[in-house]
Amino acid sequence: MSWQAYVDDHLMCEIEGHHLTSAAIIGHDGTVWAQSAAFPAFKPEEMANIMKDFDEPGFLAPTGLFLGPTKYMVIQGEPGAVIRGKKGSGGVTVKKTGQALVIGIYDEPMTPGQCNMVIEKLGDYLIEQGM
């Protein structure tokens, strides 16, 4: 299965009638493996900062998580494994696997829990596959 198929079929799928706003699978080095059409253009340092937060949990808390033009307030996650951010009625979930970051962005009516479920399920699968 191609990386794009993982994004299209597993991340952008319908969940209780709702979809993520956008999603991507990005290598630890910031290289885009696959992304949905609406995934924001981001700066290399934004991915570097996300990776640093996985290595040093709490690194992003004072400044926020930036992804393209949007700043998310970092909320409870799982140190070294999951970063969650919130902005208004939407947010972002980032799951780290052995080689990639699985990222989902959502807005109402999708809930944070639905986004977490989709992103973490694929992330856990990729970890099981050695990815």
Curated annotation (Swiss-Prot):
* Compartments (UniProt record): Cytoplasm, Cytoskeleton
GO MF entries: actin monomer binding; proline-rich region binding
Q: Which PROSITE patterns match?
A: PROFILIN
Q: Where are the transmembrane segments?
A: none
Q: A Pfam family name for this chain?
A: Profilin
The Gene Ontology biological process terms listed for this entry are: nuclear migration; regulation of actin cytoskeleton organization
Q: Family, per the entry? A: Belongs to the profilin family.
The record describes the protein's role as:
Binds to actin and affects the structure of the cytoskeleton. At high concentrations, profilin prevents the polymerization of actin, whereas it enhances it at low concentrations. By binding to PIP2, it inhibits the formation of IP3 and DG.
Subunit: Occurs in many kinds of cells as a complex with monomeric actin in a 1:1 ratio.
Name this protein carries in UniProt: Profilin
State the organism named in the record: Cynodon dactylon
Q: What is this protein's gene name?
A: PRO1
